[in-house]
């Protein structure tokens, strides 16, 4: 029965992984989450909190125009999209090396210095953040559904390794099946097992929804088993086919979704800087609207929105990392640094469903393998490759659901078309943001409670 409050009510899981935004960058100012007012924020070796990222006070002779700050630090600063072109900020480095130097073995003091080295005078963008005025649709999702404020990307690195965790929980650290994968480079075809293949073997339906422009983010295309799949096979039909725009919406509205859907954005809709959050919001809204348009589909569907990694954008929470030598969690190929694979920095994750309504926060520690483990819980299909450390460290998303709470009506969300049109205009007509100088202002997090999911009467 609809609203009975149990795992078996869920018939469809839709997962959309967008690109390159950190949690603090989007939601550090959101009330009731672990944001800019975090009482547990760590202290740096300078004696300041982690938000005071060390910055050169004077420019070196070799680069006299390098960004400096007389305060010796740079605080998070608002990217005001109403008065500047800040909907379209440049990307900052999220390469394996610079992600690890930003993390700095857990000291968390390298965000500005690493990105000045990698990106020159665009480096300070690492500390920029948005407010509700700048990304109203994203905030509306958080205010109406459940946001995860301890969700980490899986790898201290870029898109490809993180999306490999998204579909396989693995980057082949010992280099026996085409890896290790620490960068976005065309590989020898990968040969380890993916979760979609495990679903196929178990007879569980799934589909990749992608257009011809998939921004090279469907990493299944890099696997030998998919590259060699016959045109009529499940691996090809579900994993490699491209669709015209609107196919997912049609399938959702006509109750034809598979058990698992993975959505792939186009480049423009991906939210990867310098593409706009507003274009991403319009894309996300179209998917949620299609699910909600059919009450029967809404009543049995979970939509998970997450982000592959943080770009080079600051987040203040120290990611969980394993002890040195943990099997499957360090790159062991000769010549590689003895760095952990992850977890990476926090990224946004919002779960949209009848059982996650109410503006809740889920604070269990998650990463990209958590979505796979939720599918494992739902389907009974075991994830290949996932390490014991990942299973012990990151949850399976179940704690984000409030099955004890009877679902309410689908909330009304703000429109996205007007916001997108305004964003396009502002990007083309307003000046670029300026970076703070001396006498900086500490970022303000809005106040207010945020309830946690209630699962007490009907446990998963």
What are these regions (language model features)?
Residues 1-460:
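N-terminal pro-sequences and low-complexity stem/linker regions of secreted or lumenal proteins
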């Amino acid at each position: 029965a609809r609203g009975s409050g149990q795992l078996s009510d869920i018939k469809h899981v839709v997962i959309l992984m967008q690109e390159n935004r950190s949690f603090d960058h989007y939601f550090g100012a959101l009330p009731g989450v672990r944001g800019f007012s975090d009482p547990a924020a760590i202290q740096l070796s300078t004696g300041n909190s982690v938000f005071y990222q060390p910055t050169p006070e004077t420019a070196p002779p070799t680069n006299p125009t390098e960004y400096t700050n007389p305060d010796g630090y740079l605080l998070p600063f608002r990217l005001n999209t109403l008065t500047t072109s800040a909907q379209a900020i440049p990307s900052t480095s999220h390469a394996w090396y610079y992600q690890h130097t930003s993390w700095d073995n857990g000291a968390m003091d390298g965000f500005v210095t690493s990105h000045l080295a990698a990106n020159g005078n665009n480096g300070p963008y690492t500390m920029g953040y948005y407010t509700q005025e700048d990304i109203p649709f994203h905030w509306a999702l958080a205010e109406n559904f459940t946001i995860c404020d301890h969700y980490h990307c899986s790898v201290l690195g870029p898109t490809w390794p993180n999306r490999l965790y998204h579909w396989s929980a693995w980057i082949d650290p010992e280099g026996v099946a085409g890896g290790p994968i620490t960068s976005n480079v065309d590989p020898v075809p990968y040969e380890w097992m993916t979760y979609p293949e495990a679903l196929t073997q178990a007879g569980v339906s799934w589909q990749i929804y992608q257009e011809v422009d998939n921004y090279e983010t469907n990493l299944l295309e890099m696997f030998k088993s998919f590259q060699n799949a016959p045109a009529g096979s499940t691996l090809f039909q579900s994993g490699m086919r491209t669709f015209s725009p609107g196919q997912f919406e049609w399938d959702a509205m006509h109750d034809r979704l598979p058990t698992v859907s993975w959505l792939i954005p186009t480049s423009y809709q991906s939210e990867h800087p310098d593409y706009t959050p507003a274009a991403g919001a319009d894309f996300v809204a179209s998917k949620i609207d299609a699910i909600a348009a059919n009450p029967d589909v809404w009543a049995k569907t979970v939509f998970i929105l997450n982000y592959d990694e943080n770009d080079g954008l600051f987040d203040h929470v120290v990611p969980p990392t394993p002890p040195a030598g943990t099997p499957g969690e360090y790159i062991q190929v000769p010549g590689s640094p003895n760095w952990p694979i992850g977890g990476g920095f926090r990224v946004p994750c919002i779960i949209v469903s009848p059982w996650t309504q109410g503006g809740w926060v889920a604070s269990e520690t998650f990463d990209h393998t958590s979505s796979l483990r939720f599918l494992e819980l739902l389907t009974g299909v075991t994830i290949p490759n996932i390490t014991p450390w990942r299973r012990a460290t990151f949850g399976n998303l179940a704690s984000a659901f409030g099955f004890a709470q009877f679902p309410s009506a689908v909330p009304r969300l703000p429109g996205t078309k007007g916001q997108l049109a305004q964003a396009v205009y502002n990007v083309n007509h307003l000046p670029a943001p300026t970076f703070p100088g001396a006498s900086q202002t500490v970022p303000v997090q809005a106040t207010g409670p945020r309830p946690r999911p209630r699962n007490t009467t009907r446990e998963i």
